[in-house]
Amino acid sequence: HIEKGTVWQPQWAGVTFEQKMKNMVGDLNVCSKKGLSERFDSTIGAATVLMPFGGAYQLTPQNAMVAKLPVDGETSTCSGMAWGYNPYLMSANQYVGARMAVIESVTKLVATGFRYEDAYLTFQEYFERLGNKPERWGKPLAALLGALDAQIGLGIASIGGKDSMSGSFEQLDVPPTLVSFATAIGKASRVVSTEFKKPESTVVLVRPIIDPETGCPNFFSLKANYKIVENMIEEGMVASACSVGYGGIAEALFKMGLGNRIGFKMRADMTTHQMFEPMYGSIILEMVSDSPAGMLLGETTKEYTFESCGEKLDMAELQEIWESKLEPVYPYRKAGPAVEKINGSLTAPAAPKIGVAKPKVIIPVFPGTNCEYDTAKAFARAGADPEILVVRNLTPADVAESCEALVKAIDASQIVMLPGGFSGGDEPDGSGKFITAFFRNPVIKEKVHALLKERDGLMAGICNGFQALIKLGLVPYGEIIEPSADTPTLTFNTIGRHQSRLVNTRVASNKSPWLSSSNVGDIHTVAISHGEGRFVCPKELFLSLIHISEPTRPISI
């Protein structure tokens, strides 16, 4: 039993464009989710093509997730994945809602630089408990028919999915749910991000013909538009692109401007209703050159404003509404105290006593380590000879054999590199403890000291590995020591959660051999992903580290 669906249109409160914009950007389906997104790692594997949020200010949400394939070597082949789903539309009309979910997911892929013909789909379905009510059974059937219609219309297929018909608790039911995930393989060189790139760019809208009976895009028109956008991206004509969805043109233009704080001035004669109309299947393009297709919307501006419908809105004010909505739940703008700018300088050349044309790097891999391949690749790219050694701990004999193998490897190497991850699952109660326990083995400890003090070797660590260096005492003392109450450590972030993002770091001193080719004051943008990234130590030790007073132990920085 399939009931006839109803028509859904969002009703943003207010009369003026400004009133509707403020209500729209503060809507839970539109507002910033950055504080939630940063809890999930977005850079592991060193293959990320698009960060979740684009632009210099990392604020514009991307259309799709894109990363290069994890291969042993270099590649420009990448995979993209995007989703589509509107719970309000699905509640009103399951057939149309599922159809639009497929269209939305595929349109996001096309806007990101992938070809729609290369796409495959997978569905996540979730419906109320069906029981013996025919109208409830009709909801998943209508949704599947709508999704099937979209697959036939686009000529692409779903290759899997997951469904559940248990979305009820007492009197509560989940809304009819069919989330479409579209994925495709493409080239990183074709990938287009969502944020506006510069002022004074022409912005156009590519919109398909709408079927008046269903309110859905005509598939012949939709596929023709996909081809037009794909060809313009191939020719390098597109600077940025955004799929139009839930909040219409207004939402898309607003979010495109956030990442680089670029404004927009509307030239097209658009009504307030048209600005907020959900236009699934439509794509907004920022052009590098004149567009051979599409409707002219307007141009980007240096002034951080949004001008449309005879009104000129302050984008900074809209941005604050957008960011503050979920800030109490998922904070991400917490500022730490100001820190003193520290400067050091290189007083002696950082060169090893014994020159080696191709230094050997041993990379021990512990249970839970997850970035050994990209670490090895980075060393190989720099001219070193990396070797990965897997530490096995299934049996006591395995542990003993791994210790012996690592001892021999350290003897034959000039560098020991501790990669990142979650060694030992970050248990018990903290990171890096499995690695530190392993390196406190007397024989391994002796070999590490010989490498650093007698053979002028080096050690490095990233993430979990760097935590181990600190907890062992190798940073800052240059030797493995027993922990004490005043031993430095890394502790939980002040924001109270894991965070994954890009940050700017400043070189304060280049006395370390690792930074000897850098200049004091150099700024680097680096990826971070950690829950324990705050270095803490006694004030006296901190002063020693910045050479304001004499260190109580030899300091290695």
Please describe what each predicted stretch is:
Residues 114, 244, 464-465, 531:
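Conformational gate/switch positions in structured elements
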Residues 166-168, 189, 467-471, 477-478, ...:
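Short, well-ordered, mixed-charge alpha-helical segments that flank or form enzyme active sites
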Residues 198-199, 235-237, 259, 278-280, ...:
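Short gly/pro-enriched beta-turn/loop segments at secondary-structure junctions
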Residues 213, 240, 249-251, 469, ...:
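Short acidic/glycine-rich loop or secondary-structure boundary segments that cap or lie
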Residues 546-557:
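Single conserved hydrophobic/aromatic residue that forms the stacking wall/gate
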